[in-house]
Amino acid sequence: MPLYTVSTGRSLSVPNRKALANLIMDVHCVITGAPKTFVNVMYCDNIPLEDGLQMNVLGAVRKGRTAEMNATLQNTLIDKITEMFNMSDLQLDLSLFEVPAQWVMEGGEILPEPGEEDQCEWLQKGHNA
């Protein structure tokens, strides 16, 4: 958790996929404090997108963060992705939807709610995915 699904009309090159995954991971972790091993990015190629769009990014994120944090996350991702691919914000559709933490497992363990990470014994011992 989170899972970001990146859909494009054409396949991205492997270097662009790696760079985009690292960008998404870095932005998500800096803003939310999530461990890097929690961030997942999946690519879907040759997807018909709405006219004018080059990319669609759908992020499933843990429910319970503030609306302000989610807005900062969304806006920062939009700014950085459009800069990386030299596109306007009208060519990128990026949205986040919240998923309850108890619906998700990482390494066979149920995720803690946002803000309760310090009470999570398995996470404090170190999470290695």
Regions found by a protein language model. Name each.
Residues M1-A129:
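Interaction-mediating elements
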